[in-house]
Amino acid sequence: MFKMVSSPHTHSGKLTAHIMLWVILAMMPAFFTQIYYFGFGVVLQSALAIGTAIIAEFIAIKLRGKKPLNYLSDFSVALTALILAMAIPPYAPYWIIIIGTLCAVLLGKQVYGGLGQNPFNPAMIGYVILLISFPLQMTTWMPPINLLQEPPTFSDTFSLIFSGLTTDGFTLSQLTHNIDGITQATPLDSAKIFYKSHNQLSDFYELIKLPIFMGNGTDFAQGWWQINVAFLAGGIFLILKRIIHWQIPVAMLVTFFCLATATAFTGFTHLSAISQLVSGAMMFGAFFIATDPVTASITPRGKIIFGALVGLFVYLIRYHGNYPDGVAFAILLSNICVPLIDHYTRPRVSGYPTKGRK
């Protein structure tokens, strides 16, 4: 006896859980690179985020009258939590990541019905809520630990996150007292602050003398470009594994690079276009966030348009907005446009003539 089931009758064999695990695996080079340059904070933030996400998802699914284990086993909520944990400052207070994770899971995902129903990237919903609500905590970054006289140990990190003090009673700002105060911001923050009072091209050489930059005549920032390269390597791995498509990251990066390069010829002072590509969350966003299959465009041409739109928004925010990075806002703004993009880029159905032809 044959059993009738709905289409599709053949599929790639890639289960949701397998895809999520591949993405998590591809993030590991950047995860360990972040530990190397910024300490153990990301480990504790990830543990808090994943634990909070699992509990929140369990309760939400239970309240909807469904079996939580059937949904938790796809690892999607763990990936959301890990993305958020790697996006916030590693030494942010513990309540920051808990609030952000709850917002990501409940407001960014479950309120729409769960996995596959959300129109916006859940991790970016949580991140943007935190950035708007707690700007001080979300913009206070520890400089690379190799610049510190006494890098925080694991116990210091635990104490900083949960009490705001190290085991010896020092605050985060006191740990960096021997470094220029601007280094508690990211390189993009530092550049935006610097160029508000320095608008000459010659002032570029004053900027790159700051401790967070390499000190070899370039504007590549210590720790940040290495993390971005690690995300790039992980992203290429996902493309080769056919977990993600190349159109979105390539369109995003090329669009931003072209606009940033063109702007440089107008005399507008900022970090170089190459440095911008390996600063902030550029590679993270291009390969691991913008490519979310639920919230991104699904058509071949739509992916290119969507990626280019993200790149355009990142450029506008970084160069002309108040926020130094802009990747999270750019992705959410582009998510809004996805239904329209997909509507106008639908492939022609086989056997049907194109519009205007008989």
From Swiss-Prot:
Keywords: Cell inner membrane, Cell membrane, Electron transport, Flavoprotein, FMN, Membrane, Phosphoprotein, Translocase, Transmembrane, Transmembrane helix, Transport. One of its GO terms (cellular component) is plasma membrane. The chain crosses the membrane at residues 19-39, 41-61, 79-99, 125-145, 220-240, 248-268, 271-291, 297-317, 321-341. Its main location: membrane. The keyword Flavoprotein applies. Its EC number is 7.-.-.-. Its cofactor is FMN. GO terms for biological process: electron transport chain; transmembrane transport. It is a multi-pass membrane protein. It is found in: Cell inner membrane. The modification FMN phosphoryl threonine is found at T186. It holds the Pfam family NQR2_RnfD_RnfE. It is an enzyme of class 7 (translocase). HAMAP family: RsxD_RnfD. Belongs to the NqrB/RnfD family. The complex is composed of six subunits: RnfA, RnfB, RnfC, RnfD, RnfE and RnfG. Part of a membrane-bound complex that couples electron transfer with translocation of ions across the membrane. This is Ion-translocating oxidoreductase complex subunit D. It comes from Haemophilus influenzae (strain 86-028NP).
